[in-house]
Amino acid sequence: MSHQRGGDSEGPQTSLERMNRFQAPEAGRIIAELGLPQGSRGLDVGCGVGLYALWLAEAVGSAGRVVGIEPETERVEAARALVGGQLASGRLEFRQGDGTNIPLPDRSVDWLWCGDVLHHIVETQLALREFRRVVRPGGQIIIKESQVLSALFLPGHPELERRIQLAEIRRTLDEGGGRSFQERRQTTLASLRAVGLTDVAVRNYLLQRRAPLGAADHDYIQNTVFTRNWGARLRELLTPADWDARSALCEPDSPKNILRSPDYFCLYPITVFHCGSTAAAR
């Protein structure tokens, strides 16, 4: 398998849906600023539960078409179940497919979206060349990566949060084929340039949430960030003192859980790498 999302003890569909719903308020703006043509054909590589594929399909209108691909059958079925019936037949389709071996003909789509997936693909340049193969000359390739810059989830505890983030980077070294996910995210621009994609606009978006948190925001921060990402998988990489401090702030039943604070806020960055032309030689 060419790409996997590691560490999903709660199940990948649940984790991905939580992240997408957390990002939903800003997703419309991010997609609108891409300027995708009405009636265009697009591909979502690593579509997850299909929410971004749905939003992209809505953006290109009733004459447009979006295909979402995932390497595992269960994820394709999950996307179909969650959003597959929300648009008229033919506008949104989900297929099994891999980012390094896309089941589409050459130059068959107007644009390609890859959201929070490229850093999971060990064969990065192979995937990017495959992206170029399926996008028509003059089309668009869009890579979205969350947390190229580190997020802030523990305001007032900067040193502890940095150590937790460092532990998470170390944990993803094996999952990332010897390079951490953070390193892969931060070298996205270099990877694009290495395959001849030099016409790249980079946009950064800063998501801000503050107390009282909405249900989707609380669900993502508590269950995906604190419990899944910063949970048992990091325990051996933190000192006992740091683990205890993390537990006091992050465990849902802790009276000191930071999400209980009326002053709580978080900052969460998203970076979009927008390649406006794919006409250069392969």
Give the location of each predicted region.
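A short acidic, Gly/Pro-enriched loop at the edge of an enzyme's catalytic core
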Residues: T100-W111
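Core SAM-dependent methyltransferase catalytic element
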Residues: V195-T198, Y268-R282
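Conserved catalytic/acceptor-binding region of the Class I
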Residues: I142-A215
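A short SAM/SAH-binding and catalytic strip from SAM-dependent methyltransferases
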Residues: D110-E123
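Class I SAM-dependent methyltransferase SAM/SAH-binding core
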Residues: L43, V49-N101
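A short glycine-rich, Lys/Arg-flanked "PGG" loop and its adjoining helix->strand segment in the class I
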Residues: Q125-Q140
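C-terminal helical/coil "lid" or tail adjacent to the Rossmann-like core of SAM-dependent
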Residues: S2-P12, A201-Y264
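Conserved alpha-helix/loop element of class I SAM-dependent methyltransferases that forms part
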Residues: R21-Q38, W55
